[in-house]
Amino acid sequence: MIKRMLTAASVTLILSSGFAQNNTIYIELLGNGLLYSLNYDRMVTDKISVRAGYGGLTVSNSTVSSGVIVTEDIKITLIPVLANYLRGEGNHKLEIGGGIVLVSLDYTGNVADVDFSLAADGAIPTGNLGYRYQKSEGGFFFKASLCPFFAETMVTSVGLGFGYSF
């Protein structure tokens, strides 16, 4: 499922490459990528952009319980893929977007020399609503947004993005 979604996101970005010259590379703290994400954003028209990113987190833990060593590793990979509508004049825009976050979870552990693992993949619908500063001629890029995740319960994060448009 993840491979099909990545293919769809790649095709979207490739097809949009003929319509505009505005590319942006930026880092978003928190937001749609959980703790952080590295993102590529492409302007399709002067009001529409598409975005794909990569974020991840690895946590390792070792404990001793009743004389038994327990080790655990959790790796979470997040790939936000969104389309955005931009409203406003000049360099200052309101950004409204929606898409999905592809999630991959790998859990491995060892208890008393017995290895075990668990892996899961999925997609979480997401959105964003916020402010975007981007010059049409390129240069410094900034965004601040609210990023809801529509899982069993809605969870909202805030995101701050800094980067470069070219």
Tell where the protein language model's regions lie, with residue ranges.
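Sec-dependent signal peptide recognition
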Residues: I2-A8
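Hydrophobic alpha-helical targeting segments used for export or membrane insertion
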Residues: S10-V11, L15
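Sec/Tat signal peptide C-region and signal peptidase I cleavage site
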Residues: S16-A20
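Short, surface-exposed connector motifs at secondary-structure boundaries
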Residues: Q21-N23, F140
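Solvent-exposed loop/turn segments connecting transmembrane beta-strands
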Residues: T24-N39, G55-T58, D121, C147-G159
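Membrane-embedded beta-strand positions in outer-membrane beta-barrel channels/transporters
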Residues: Y26, S37, P80-L82, T126-N128, ...
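Gram-negative (and chloroplast) outer-membrane scaffold detector with strong preference
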Residues: D41-L146
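Polar-ligand-bearing catalytic/cofactor-coordination segments
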Residues: S165
